[in-house]
Amino acid sequence: MAKHTLVAVGGSGQSAAIAFLRLATLSGMPPEELPNIYVIDADVKDRQGADAKPSLYSSLKVLFTQLVQGVPETNKPRLELIFPYSHQQSHEVM
């Protein structure tokens, strides 16, 4: 069966992806059936300091990691952060 894909663009897309993962959890969706999630955002930054609020991407990453814990690598869905501009070449893959 083909793996589904969820593309989360910007902060609103990340909020929607978090809501989807919560709904999938509440509805009992097996973690192997979660879609691959691609986050496209030019503004994602690592926040520093004690007063820094967690970013949406950080929250999404934590939730996703918890949900797919224990899933074999061959069946594990992907979470990938993509920067849309050529000067931001690096991206993160989980």
What positions do the PLM features span?
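Segments that form or flank anion-binding pockets
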Residues: 1-94
